[in-house]
Amino acid sequence: MSDSREIKKPWWFKKAKEWADEFYTRDQKLEDSDRRDLSKKYATISKASVVGAATGLSAGLGGPYAYRYYTTGALKGVKLPRTILLGVVSMVIMRNVAAKIAWDKELKKLDPSGELKQNYKSAHKTVDDVSLSDNSTSVQKKYGMMKFLKYRTAPRWAMYFEGTYQHPDRKFPNPDQMVQDLKGSRRAFPPFFSKADKFWHQIDRKDNDHT
């Protein structure tokens, strides 16, 4: 029977912690040369997303006017609010499409034969297992990291990997240590953080019960 005092950590906390743990593990295995290469790859993806966003915005804003002029010979009658909305939607869609295409191309450069991609789809052995092992190659580690991070926040990762290449001391910290630091500093919070303090207290008690 479980302890009635036990509290479940919020789903968002668990998800964030799981993501942080995996990223930290992958990040620690990267060499300086890996970081530089990943920075360049994500910079390329970032540039592609900017071009895609600009193309989508231009098409969304200019499309209705071009269609109106083609069908009526005049530009009057185009509803501006609808056109702006179409432009924004087109910008977001094309940004993601362009980033995805660039991301696929960069993965292909790492895996021209398709071997890593095939392993990644395997039900028994994934590229994640290989890229996280102590014997993983530079290509496997970079491929695994890019598969993990995806492409939607390319500018952030381009800056992160370049920054940690230049300054290794700025690497992502150990998530377990971050949690311990938060626990240690919780009593410095103002009174309106009392619920957060209660949450950390219950986590402390749960951890102590298992020791």
From Swiss-Prot:
The gene is PUP1. It is found in: Mitochondrion membrane. It comes from Candida glabrata (strain ATCC 2001 / BCRC 20586 / JCM 3761 / NBRC 0622 / NRRL Y-65 / CBS 138) (Yeast). It comes from the Eukaryota. InterPro entries: Pup1-like. This is PDR1 up-regulated protein 1. Mitochondrial protein that contributes to the enhanced virulence of C.glabrata strains that acquired azole resistance. Induction: Expression is inducible by fluconazole. Expression is positively regulated by the master transcriptional regulator PDR1 which probably binds the PDRE motifs TCCACGGA (positions -770 to -763) and TCCGTGGA (positions -740 to -733) of its promoter. Keywords: Membrane, Mitochondrion, Transmembrane, Transmembrane helix, Virulence. The chain crosses the membrane at residues 45-67, 82-99. One of its GO terms (cellular component) is mitochondrion. The keyword Transmembrane applies. The keyword ATP-binding does not apply. Belongs to the PUP1 family.
